[in-house]
Amino acid sequence: MKKLALLGSAGVIVVSALVACSSASDGPSLPPGPDKDAADFKRDGSGYDSATSPESGLGELLFRPNSVYSGTDGTHTFKVPVAVYDADADLTVTASDAAGITLAKTTLKNPVDPDGVTDNGKYFLITAKKAGVYTLTATSKGRSTTASVTISSYDPARYAAGKARYEAAGSGPDRPCTTCHVNGGAIDHSPAALATATDQEIGIIITTGVKPGPNVIQITSEPGTLHKWNVTDPQKDGLVTYLRSLDPRGFQ
């Protein structure tokens, strides 16, 4: 694949623009300087750009993605999607600890992407119940494959702090996140788009306007303006939690 795919080919997960308040597109890599330094954090194997997955369903049983992240605070519901490719009707998907995460089958609202490619993945929504690292195992046609699910523990107060900043303007010219992610282009930054992003990575996008690569995220309607916001640490942590709690977009 051209980029590490988040899920399949239906285009429901477009992540080059996500997290706190913008319609964005990739810009060039950062030049040397403080912003570049801020973006040079250690990668942990995750990635969160979706792209068409041409090899999906061509003979290899696999999860897409094979490593996802979510959280739980004991109060709100947190879900994250995952798909299995090249599975037959005998597909079974199990979790290493059914008390920690649960699985429910789901389907895409629009399984055919703008290029006419049909996403043939079998989708599941994972609901987080308790913090921990879990293994999903998919079995079909005598083959097995696995994926990891990392669930973080959040203080319930983080949700309220994140929701407040999401819906209200920040300091200076910083706008509410709803300006571009609910209204305007309604750019997806639900768990469908952020499944493979760690909490650290989401926080870096919010505060630096840079996504792993690193690539600069620019607001397309405002040339030269980065997707970079002034937030306090509680607001940043709250936004991470709140975004994790959104309903994954693009599913029935």
List the model feature ranges, each with a label.
Residues 118-131, 226-228:
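Extracellular/luminal low-complexity segments enriched in Ser/Thr/Pro
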